[in-house]
From Swiss-Prot:
The keyword Transferase applies. One of its GO terms (molecular function) is 3-deoxy-manno-octulosonate cytidylyltransferase activity. This is 3-deoxy-manno-octulosonate cytidylyltransferase. Its EC number is 2.7.7.38. GO terms for cellular component: cytosol.
Length: 253
């Protein structure tokens, strides 16, 4: 089974232009993501998908593989699908290019269900919410699943909405696991054929309302397997986030 991890990387990021090439301990951020992804035991190969020659040059400079894509893509999924269409892979993994601390074990956790069950078309990850701030934040995507681990819904709103427990919504309730809530981790695994099909689907009502592409899958009647992980990473959307990454690395020595 051939499993390809693709890292979409744009240069023209609105909040942090050129972040893929931001230096972290002497390496561009995209190199950190690439090298960590390559350490996942289930990944056969890693490719950076980008629309900028500067990123292509940086990736090739450290010996990585990069593919140029159209500049007209509106989403990372579209960029992913363009590269996937050129490949003969069985499974495609979408690894976010702005998570330089991603743990290779997270990637393997997400891949395992599809590698073991050929009926599964798509998978992703979730991790426990540990603070009231994250539970209420629209920037933290929440997910609820059924008893078998399939996604029921993703939302930027508090999910579930504890109708009779708002007085219990304190940090301690989350850290003690009195309230069991999960945030979505944006790492996706697709059967290649399904990814290409997904990219051709029209945007859906709930997807546009929440600005969450994965809802397109649910609205079209398909299932998403969601695996719980204990690993957490830091997404770099701003220079301030980059400072957090540098602090984390400093603490690790």
């Amino acid at each position: 089974m051939k499993i390809t991890a693709i890292i979409p990387a744009r240069y023209a990021s609105t909040r942090f232009e050129g972040k893929a090439l931001a230096q972290i301990q002497g390496k561009p951020m995209v190199q950190h993501v690439y090298e960590r992804t390559l350490k996942a035991s289930l990944v056969s190969e890693v490719i950076v998908a980008t629309d900028d020659e500067r990123i292509v040059a940086a990736v090739r400079a450290f010996g990585g593989r990069a593919e140029m894509t159209s500049r007209s893509h509106e989403t990372g999924t579209d960029r992913l699908a363009e590269v996937a269409a050129r490949l003969d892979s069985d499974i495609i993994v979408n690894v976010q290019g702005d998570e330089p601390l991603i743990d290779p074990a997270m990637i393997d956790e997400a891949i395992s269900p599809l590698a073991e069950d050929s009926s599964l078309l798509m998978g992703t990850l979730k991790t426990r919410i540990k603070s009231l701030h994250d539970f209420l934040s629209p920037n933290v995507v929440k997910v609820v699943t059924d008893w078998e681990g399939y996604a029921l819904y993703f939302s930027r709103s508090p999910l579930p909405n504890f109708r009779d427990k708002w007085n219990d919504l304190k940090d301690e309730a989350f850290s003690s696991r009195k309230l069991l809530c999960f945030k979505h981790v944006g790492l996706y695994v697709y059967r290649r054929e399904f990814l290409l099909q997904f990219a051709q689907m029209s945007p859906t009502y709930l997807e546009m309302a929440e600005k969450l592409e994965q809802l397109r899958v649910l609205e079209n009647g398909y299932r998403i397997k969601v695996v719980e992980t204990d690993f957490e990473s830091i997404g770099v959307d701003t220079p301030g986030d980059l400072d957090k990454v540098l602090e984390r690395l400093k603490d690790r020595g």
